[in-house]
Each structure stands twice: as structure tokens, then as C-alpha cells.
């Protein structure tokens, strides 16, 4: 919810870091979240995150690249795509998208 309310680059980066480094990978993270998916705050939080990571060029992926201070266009585009695709995978697996 911090990403939605505060709009800080580090909030998006923290989410990306978790998606990238979660022990066991994204499928394990899905399994960990799944028992809580019907909780209202979980739904609200995931929807707010989904809004920020709606496309490759939305604020979530952009903030990830900004926080890492990636300037080279191809590297920046690749990082933004990776951030979007990981979040998209998680949200689709959780049936948020």
C-alpha cells in the first residue's frame, strides 16, 4: 500500500527485489500468498500494486529502473520489462489479473 500512497521509487524496487529473490521463486510466493487471498486488505494491496505495474511503462517498472539509476536505454527497457513480467506473472497466478 505504501507504493500507492507514497509513490516512492524504493517501494517499487522493494517489491521487485522480493519478486526476484523470494526463496523458491515466484511459484513459492504464490503458494505463500494464496491462503490469504480472500482477505480484504490483501486484495486491496494487490490491486493497488497491480495499478502501478499495469504495463511495462507504468510507474512501478519505471520506479524500479529509476531507483537502480539505470540510464542505458536497452538495459533500462529490459529491467522495466522484467519488473512488469514478474509482477504480471504473480498477479495472474493469484487471479488478480
Region locations from a protein language model:
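Compositionally biased terminal segments of proteins
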Residues: 1-97
Amino acid at each position: 500500500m505504501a507504493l500507492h500512497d507514497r509513490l516512492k521509487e524504493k517501494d517499487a524496487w522493494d517489491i521487485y527485489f522480493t519478486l526476484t529473490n523470494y526463496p523458491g521463486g515466484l511459484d513459492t510466493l504464490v503458494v505463500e500468498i494464496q491462503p490469504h487471498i480472500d482477505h480484504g486488505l490483501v486484495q486491496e494491496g494487490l490491486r493497488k500494486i497491480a495499478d502501478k505495474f499495469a504495463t511495462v511503462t507504468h510507474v512501478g517498472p519505471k520506479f524500479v529502473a529509476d531507483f537502480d539509476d539505470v540510464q542505458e536505454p536497452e538495459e533500462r527497457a529490459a529491467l522495466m520489462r522484467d519488473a512488469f513480467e514478474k509482477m504480471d506473472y504473480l498477479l495472474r497466478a493469484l487471479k488478480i489479473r
